[in-house]
């Protein structure tokens, strides 16, 4: 497994804990709003900063897609 995939799984698990939902629900939401590949491809940015910044970014991206 490559480092991007490992980090993506870690990010999904931590984001699910943060939102108090299942990782399946997180992935389904990302898929619903066509964000899965975008988030996956943000490895270079997300793995270098505080994970809370990634959470905020994901929240903002989902909210933007909802509106």
Stretches found by the model and what they are:
Residues 44-67:
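Long, compositionally biased
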Residues 4, 18, 37, 64-66:
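Mixed-charge, low-complexity intrinsically disordered regions
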Residues 1-7, 40-51:
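Charged, low-complexity, helix/coiled-coil-prone segments
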Residues 14-15, 30, 64:
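Low-complexity, intrinsically disordered/propeptide-like segments
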Residues 1-25:
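N-terminal acidic leader/helix
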Residues 6, 24, 33, 49-56:
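Generic alpha-helical secondary structure signal
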């Amino acid at each position: 497994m490559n480092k991007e995939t490992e980090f993506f799984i870690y990010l999904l698990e931590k984001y699910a804990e943060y939102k108090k939902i299942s990782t399946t629900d997180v992935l389904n939401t990302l898929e619903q709003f066509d964000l899965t590949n975008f988030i996956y491809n943000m490895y270079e940015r997300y793995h270098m900063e505080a994970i809370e910044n990634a959470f905020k970014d994901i929240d903002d991206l989902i909210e933007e897609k909802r509106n």
